[in-house]
Amino acid sequence: MMAAKIDPRTKIVLVLCLTSMVLVVENLAFVVGIGIISIACALLMGVQLLALIRRYQRILILLLTLSIVQSIFTPGPKVLFEVFGIPLLTEKGLEMGIKTFVRMLVILTSGVIMSTSNYRETIQGLIQWKVPYKIAFMTALSLRFIPIFTEEFQDSMVALQLKGIDFKKIPFGKKTQIYVYLITPIILSSLKHAEEIAIAMESRAFGAYQSRVEYLVLRLKGYDYGVMIAAVLLSISYVWAALMV
Amino acid sequence: MESYIKLTGISYGYPRSRFALRDINMSLNRGEIVGITGENGSGKTTLGKIIMGILMPDSGNIVIDGVDGKNLKLCERGSKIGYAFQNPDRQLFAANVRDEIIFPLEIKGMNKTLAQEKAAALLGRFELSHLKERVPMRLSRGEKQRLVLAATLAQEPGFLILDEPATGLDRDRKKALYQLMEELAREGIGLAVISHDLQFIEHHANRIIRLENGKVVDDGC
């Protein structure tokens, strides 16, 4: 698959184009268009749509809920739906809600596109783009710790339930309290991890030498340049067209 | 002795691993101290997690306090059986020691004064009263283990599973832990102590269950 061979730097450019476009463009139809393009790009990168929906089901529901809330609380002159004379949904609100949902969806899809590359390769791409090694290394470390924190979060959820707490039965007010208790050990444990890593890095003389040799070296191919140039040119044209409408 | 947990034909295999628990049959009773021992990787912790419902068995049945385990949610099992993880850090949530005991009780609807009284009594029993305002994560390992036990006992379980409770404890603390286990057993609470410290188990357990490669090879009942 060519998609698997695409250089992570090409994906970074693509993602930058998508996210920049969706933030700059204001026209509803064009915003929705960017949403469709981002999903198409994810599919071209080999992402399975159904698996993606299943994986991000909860986030998608959250995004949809946020968008609906935004629609309801945005006033506007043209009322679409009202209860006892109180406007609940306006045309402007609906437009704002859709735009919010698509914008967050594009950000989510961008993350998915980047996740199709091995994180080590992504970091190597950044290093070859002259991003300071220390910053690239920190980014790699933070990515490496995501599964660890996920596991710790799941363990904390289990441990809380073993205290006899039924998440489904507790009232909404107390649910927020529960999340504070869930997040506290994760923050403390991340601080502990950071402290331990700092000691381990110091003891291995991290950064003692200015120059480094690389085992993994990425090379941009012709199609990488093609995709990057096309993405930039198409993005500029798209934004220009959207601003002209 | 009253039977509290009954395991019949329990088997469990981890995905993508050759290790499996095979045909585990045992009865754990209230008021007794059972030592579950075996080499590293013999399945002790896996067995504890299956009893707690953290892992679901591939086959077999578990009956807890007369109720089929399949009908018990994690939180319901947690009210019947207390579980102390190998790593106490995973069970500490609150910003101070006293709140660690109080908050689950309050969330479950217990009156604040009652919860505070209960916490004070447990902190006293576990010699943690002087640390009640401290951050749990900053305690020593032994103090953390005592706090986890205190918080677990606040749920008034009928049975306790302790995973490697003696790890990191000095001789005096191990002795104190043993005395506490005896006290709890006398109060009618059953205890299963998962440990590879055979000396600790042999000295303090009423019954020793030995696991080898996921199978019970000795049940000294």
Model-inferred region functions:
Chain B
Residues 37-39:
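The feature captures the beta-strand-to-loop junction immediately N-terminal to the Walker
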Residues 52:
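Helix-to-loop junction immediately C-terminal to a conserved catalytic motif
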Residues 60-68, 77:
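Conserved ABC transporter NBD signature motif
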Residues 113-131:
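Conserved ABC ATPase "signature" region
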Residues 135-139:
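Conserved ABC ATPase signature
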Residues 160-163:
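Catalytic Walker B motif of ABC-type/P-loop ATPase nucleotide-binding domains
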Residues 195-196:
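H-loop/switch region of ABC-family ATPase nucleotide-binding domains
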